[in-house]
């Protein structure tokens, strides 16, 4: 395995200042950031809020510089003290699953940003179609790729699997062993990462940016194993031919999709998936599926489909999942009703509709688009969000 030099051992002050400013500039209005800057600058919370509202954040840079100095010294001396993470249970609005979310202090979020910035060279290991939580990728990239792959008639079999408790099941010892194996030098970066993830209750913390990138980097081992190492050798009439068992792979964080040309290749891919995941210390749910895309027992062309990233991909069309479609239709109808009654559209409803319209852009639901005047509805919702973002809330507001 090729080792990567990070070129950033957090020795220089700018290795800390650049990510800290990137993090703070995205969080000026947040209550925890306001309280931290008020404490560092000796001002009141109300004064800091007023400076942010008047776009005078340059007056707070002296407090940011003090934070950077303190963080840099704590990293150099490897002496880190952080407030405990606060955990709470939250129901996932789409799947209704209960998830344990850890809310980190703003200080730990800054250290996460520093560690994540130092890991930039290691992110090159992440596979091309590992699309979750990565800038420039996401559902749009996965949608374009799957639309292209499904039109290829050579792709006949699909394998779908899911990692059980992806964040919480990550073995921190194996993760750090992997990082020490692939990272050349940079002991301070490894110490900082190990110290930060040791504060998590089980495995890695859900809702932490550093956790997202560490999971993507760790699962890249599985991605490259399946797409580059699982080969099929065919011998016929004295000729030897070799091809990869997996012709296309898509990882949406813990959701795995493998596309193959034959049932034999699909079985080989499943075997490699289960073996490599066990080696990495992660568990694949027993509900994994292997199915034929051109199933002759299903009448009609295009009746079999791939269901991932909230969209059903048929051979020559795409549609939303039923429950997503119903929610999108209800949200659009509610906004249309409020517009006709000349009533205010709540910001929560506007955000939900904008999200659903983003999914509709990937599909061929033209009748829905025309019936609910989606273009006009989207413009109204964007105006609501734009107005909402200009309101300055108190420091403790959520």
Predicted stretch roles:
Residues 74-75, 148-274, 292, 305:
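Conserved polymerase palm-domain catalytic core
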Residues 1-73, 389-398:
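Non-catalytic, polymerase-adjacent accessory regions of viral genome-replication enzymes
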Residues 67-79, 266-281, 328:
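Inter-domain linker/hinge segments that demarcate the starts of reverse transcriptase
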Residues 111-171:
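Active-site-proximal segment of RNA-dependent polymerases
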Residues 53-55, 83-110, 126-137, 197-217, ...:
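Short, conserved non-catalytic motifs in the polymerase core
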Residues 133-142, 249, 290-298:
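Beta-rich nucleic-acid/ligand-interaction surfaces
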Residues 109, 113, 224, 231-240, ...:
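Right-hand nucleic-acid polymerase module
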